[in-house]
Regions:
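Short coil-to-helix leader/linker segments, especially the first N-terminal amphipathic alpha-helix
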Residues: 2-44
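Alpha-helical cap/lid subdomain in secreted, periplasmic
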Residues: 34, 40-47, 77-78, 82-97, ...
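Compositionally biased, intrinsically disordered low-complexity segments
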Residues: 12-13, 57, 67, 247
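A polyanion-binding, active-site-adjacent surface
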Residues: 100
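Short glycine-rich His-centered loop
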Residues: 35-73
């Protein structure tokens, strides 16, 4: 039996036994293990750098306030923590420090309001931004007021302003596209999210930042798995979804260990 058919059978079995997330974790972790290759210990982020990751609930993931981070983990339980663990375990000599400044419910408007205190005042060497999901979601969630919706023009102009304000003060910047865990590209929410993602792609090219195309990463997996294996509401991620985000980020910053 060839490898592809074997994986298909394993996937179907995992769906029945509720182990889809474990399967995805194993399959997406595998590329980081290069048996027989020398340990190269490389990553685009410079040694002794501070990497700040800012965004909404996808970044937040239960992080606690800086006031008590000395006694408890302040990176949350999502993709930020996974990235931290991978770098710490395999590139310890790099001494890369990570800061999580995600806040659940945030839009680009909220980021702009707290940019000085949560980004500029902290003087990070590297900055990663994942924002846009909550800007779109109010259009499709009856529980959210219409005024929470952020138009694509406001989203684009505000994000560009933040990039222009910050790029000269950091060594590197990473832009992550918003996403929708939906394989049907004609779905209204997916289609709108793609347009906001296009804004991020355009700005990443214009300002020569690193781009993490999260939607492309999810789309690759969605050819083999159901959306519910990654998220129940097409936004908030199960552990396997966070693993995909972490892998996409590490690939974009040329992580190799």
């Amino acid at each position: 039996m060839d490898k592809k058919n074997m994986q298909s059978i394993i996937w179907k079995k995992n769906l029945k036994t509720g182990e889809a997330e474990n399967y995805l974790k194993r399959s997406w972790s595998a590329p980081l293990v290069r048996r027989g290759h020398p340990h190269r210990d490389t990553i685009k982020i410079h040694p002794n750098s501070t990497l700040l990751m800012i965004g909404d609930s996808i970044t937040d993931c239960g992080r606690i306030s800086p006031a008590v981070e000395i006694v408890r983990d302040s990176l949350g339980y999502g993709y930020v923590k996974l990235i931290h663990n991978q770098i710490r375990a395999t590139c310890p000599k790099k001494h890369i420090r990570m800061i999580n400044r995600g806040i659940a419910g945030n839009t680009i408007r909220h980021l702009a309001m707290r940019w000085q205190s949560d980004v500029l005042d902290l003087k990070p060497d590297w900055l990663s931004i994942l924002i846009g999901i909550n800007d779109v979601w109010p259009k499709f969630d009856v529980c959210q007021p219409d005024e929470w919706f952020v138009s694509i023009d406001e989203y684009a102009s505000t994000l560009e302003h933040l990039i222009r304000t910050t790029r000269s003060q950091v060594k590197g910047m990473v832009l992550m596209t918003p996403y929708c865990i939906e394989s049907n590209r004609d779905d209204p929410m997916r289609a709108m999210m793609d347009r906001y993602g296009d804004v991020v792609r355009q700005l990443a090219g214009q300002y020569q930042t690193i781009l993490v195309d999260t939607q492309a990463a999810f789309d690759f997996v969605l050819t083999e798995v159901r959306p519910t294996a990654l998220s129940l509401d097409r936004v908030h991620l199960k552990p396997a979804g966070h693993m995909i985000l972490a892998q996409a980020f590490l690939k974009a910053v040329e992580y190799d260990s």
